Amino acid sequence: LSYKSVAGQARFEGIVSHHAAVIDVGGVGIQITIFKDGHIVTTQHMDIGTIRLYELLHKPGLTEKAYRNQIEEYINKKLEVFRALYLDAELDYIIFMNDYGINFINGMELEAKGDNLIKTEKFVKYLVKLSKNAKEDIIDELNLTNDKSNLIIPSIILFKALATKLTAKEVWIPGVNVNDGIAFD
């Protein structure tokens, strides 16, 4: 249903008519659908969702730096394999579907408010800047509730890794969710 919600947006057809990836980031895993010239090339599920990363890698006594490094290494290894198997060229676009994605966009200073299409380089730069802060400061900056606080670090690292490892020129975060897909259906 998340897919239907983004596919119903006017910009979607134009983006997937190029080389694009639609990435639905969930708690247990992510689903990546690769498009080329308007056609689906593949859809793959990977077990690197935000809750899974937290539960798998967050250990008592582990320093914050070590925790972040473990998440990054784990994600990067998975994405290197994905890239080798399924991507033969740089992507033009990545479309992210996830609740945190819109929080990241809202935290950025965009040239045109409401236009959630941004250069990947700018998006990654913002995530790097954000990740240098303490978790509490990130929560404040993004106006998040504390019930999501444990997932913010895995989310930032995951979004950054996806944007850099899949090497897209631009990122689009339409800010849709499953409820939008239900309404569209």
What are the roles of these predicted feature ranges?
Residues 29:
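Active-site-adjacent helix-turn-beta-strand microarchitecture at beta-sheet edges
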Residues 24:
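Conserved catalytic-loop position in the HRD/HxD motif
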Residues 1-19, 34-36, 42-185:
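Helical "lid/coupling" subdomains associated with nucleotide-phosphate turnover
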